[in-house]
Amino acid sequence: RTKGSKAAGATNAFRTMGAIFALSVLIIDVYKGYFSTFYIPYLIGNETIFAKTIAGFSSILGHVFPVYFKFKGGKGVGTALGTLFAFPQLYLATFIGFMSWLITLFVTGYVGLGSVISGVVVLTFYIFSSNCVINDLTFYVLFIAIFFIITHRENIKRLLNGSENQFQKIMLLNFFKKK
């Protein structure tokens, strides 16, 4: 939390601590989102989609604005990914969104851009795959897409003025190389 972007997320962990540490951070963030969205409503006896969306929303907000770290957390992407896995109706949209994130990362090198695009892709794909039915999940996925734009607003500004840091593709490719 004192190095790199000072953000508490997998991207900064990768840049400052390496791939294994970053993978650990990502797994914890995804599981945190999934656990709170899937199990908390079960434990309190209210397993409605609305209850799950409130639990998911709360876990994302808790990640981005943690009380114990003076309300300065990560950007919520890993945690949001975990919350989406708690909804079977979103599996395909989430997979397509994740693939769009990967493609954006590999083509442009911009993690934040990939995150924003993936949020919009999940929303768009879910709306069309649900025959444009508006329900609690539609609003939840809309919240996530808008929230990704808000939490990445500084990245967007830097992209527009040409000063955004690219994820070092060499680092990413070296991770997959055999040693």
Functional labels for PLM-detected ranges:
Residues 1-10, 68-81, 110-118:
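Short, non-helical or kinked segments that cap or interrupt transmembrane helices
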Residues 1-21, 157-179:
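Cytosolic, membrane-interface loops and tails of multi-pass inner-membrane proteins
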Residues 14-17, 40-44, 58, 77-108, ...:
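Interfacial segments of multi-pass membrane proteins
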Residues 19-42, 52-64, 76-78:
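Alpha-helical membrane segments and adjacent membrane-interface helices in multi-pass membrane proteins
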Residues 23, 52-57, 91-99, 116-117, ...:
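Hydrophobic alpha-helical transmembrane segments
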Residues 24, 60-71, 104-112:
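Transmembrane alpha-helix interface/packing and boundary motifs in multi-pass membrane proteins
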Residues 34, 38, 42-43, 65-68, ...:
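Structural signature of transmembrane alpha-helix termini at the membrane-water interface
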